[in-house]
């Protein structure tokens, strides 16, 4: 009778362990479903999420191996019904393994929470980068508008330079006395043209360069006006001399 009672106790413990194993399996399946639901978000997260997936997969494999060991232990317990003491020791081993499985499942739950946190952090970083991109696009658009205004001013200055150059060239035949001044003016105009071309490729300094060029052009136009006045005076002197010669 004592042996039968021991066997009955063993069977009850086996049934209790089987129930614990079923519950562990249900919990594992529930965790697996949650993990499947999070996979799509984890794929979009950073590289740590991929590493975390590998760790979760290892945990799942360990859980499968633990379930196989539990099934083996249950089979050994069924074969050990004639040896109650041996069965008792086997049950203790199974209890220890079941506790380890529960600890592993708790670890798996913590890893799942960590994966969710990483995915949320990745989403937050993406939104922050998107906001910065919108700000940079606005600044770029304003910079392009300033560059267009500078290019228009440069075009106007080029036209003015062409006009000044044409006026200077028209005075080349007026008098040999002013050829040296005209060469100097042409050299200055060429220098200004080179500076103007350089200003077109450096939009950020265009406004200051345009201001300097405008002042220089005003100075050149003033010098040109003086040259014209001197040329008129020269012609008047020549005409007066010719009149005096004719009178003689």
Swiss-Prot record:
GO BP, sorted A to Z: actin filament organization; muscle contraction
Renumbered residue ranges of the record's region Disordered: 16-47
Subunit structure: Homodimer. Heterodimer of an alpha (TPM1, TPM3 or TPM4) and a beta (TPM2) chain.
The keyword Heme is annotated on this UniProt entry: no
Cellular localisation: Cytoplasm, Cytoskeleton
Transmembrane segments: none
Protein name: Tropomyosin alpha-4 chain
Modified sites of kind Phosphoserine: 6
Pfam families per the UniProt record, alphabetical: Tropomyosin
Keyword Calcium on entry: yes
Coiled coil feature spans: 2-248
Domain of life: Eukaryota
Misc. comment: This protein can span only six actin monomers.
Function as written in the Swiss-Prot or TrEMBL entry: Binds to actin filaments in muscle and non-muscle cells. Plays a central role, in association with the troponin complex, in the calcium dependent regulation of vertebrate striated muscle contraction. Smooth muscle contraction is regulated by interaction with caldesmon. In non-muscle cells is implicated in stabilizing cytoskeleton actin filaments. Binds calcium.
Gene Ontology molecular-function annotations: actin filament binding; identical protein binding; metal ion binding; protein heterodimerization activity; protein homodimerization activity
Modified residues (Phosphothreonine): 216
SUPFAM superfamilies: Tropomyosin
Gene: TPM4
Domain notes: The molecule is in a coiled coil structure that is formed by 2 polypeptide chains. The sequence exhibits a prominent seven-residues periodicity.
Keywords: Acetylation, Actin-binding, Calcium, Coiled coil, Cytoplasm, Cytoskeleton, Metal-binding, Muscle protein, Phosphoprotein
InterPro entries: Tropomyosin, XRCC4-like_C
Matches recorded under PANTHER family: TROPOMYOSIN
């Amino acid at each position: 009778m004592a042996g039968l009672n021991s066997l009955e106790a063993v069977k009850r413990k086996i049934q209790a362990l089987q129930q614990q194993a079923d519950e562990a399996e249900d919990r594992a399946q529930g965790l697996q479903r949650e993990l499947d639901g999070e996979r799509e978000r984890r794929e979009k997260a950073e590289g740590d999420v991929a590493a975390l997936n590998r760790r979760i997969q290892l945990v799942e494999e360990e859980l499968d191996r633990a379930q196989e060991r539990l099934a083996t232990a249950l089979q050994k317990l069924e074969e050990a019904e004639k040896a109650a003491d041996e069965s008792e020791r086997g049950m203790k081993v199974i209890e220890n393994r079941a506790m380890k499985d529960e600890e592993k499942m708790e670890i798996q739950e913590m890893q799942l929470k960590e994966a969710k946190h990483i995915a949320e952090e990745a989403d937050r970083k993406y939104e922050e980068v998107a906001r910065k991109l919108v700000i940079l696009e606005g600044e770029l658009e304003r910079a392009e508008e300033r560059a267009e205004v500078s290019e228009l001013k440069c075009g106007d200055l080029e036209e003015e330079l062409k006009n000044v150059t044409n006026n200077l060239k028209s005075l080349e035949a007026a008098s040999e006395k002013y050829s040296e001044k005209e060469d100097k003016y042409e050299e200055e105009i060429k220098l200004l043209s080179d500076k103007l071309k350089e200003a077109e490729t450096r939009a950020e300094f265009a406004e200051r360069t345009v201001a300097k060029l405008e002042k220089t052009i005003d100075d050149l136009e003033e010098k040109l006006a003086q040259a014209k006045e001197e040329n008129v005076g020269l012609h008047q002197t020549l005409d007066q001399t010719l009149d005096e010669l004719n009178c003689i």
